[in-house]
């Protein structure tokens, strides 16, 4: 089973929605809110759909609302892949 990595997620974000020129996605962006990275809800819906298709998981309709940072989306995806619940440090912290 292949888990989603930050590098994988950033590639998917770029492919699904492009990259904001003023944002350096090469830096430490795991805990930066998607909106601060220049990605709106439509971009995230496209990315979540691609994750669901590529990784064979169902993240649910509220994935975009709950996963406000790359770390939270990665944890949510990998928890779904492994059958575990997302860690308290990810999605819960981002609320």
UniProtKB/Swiss-Prot annotation:
4'-phosphopantetheine is transferred from CoA to a specific serine of the apo-ACP-like protein. Coiled coil: none annotated. Residues 3-81 form the Carrier domain. It comes from the Bacteria. The modification O-(pantetheine 4'-phosphoryl)serine is found at residue 41. The keyword Transport does not apply. This is Oxytetracycline polyketide synthase acyl carrier protein. It comes from Streptomyces rimosus.
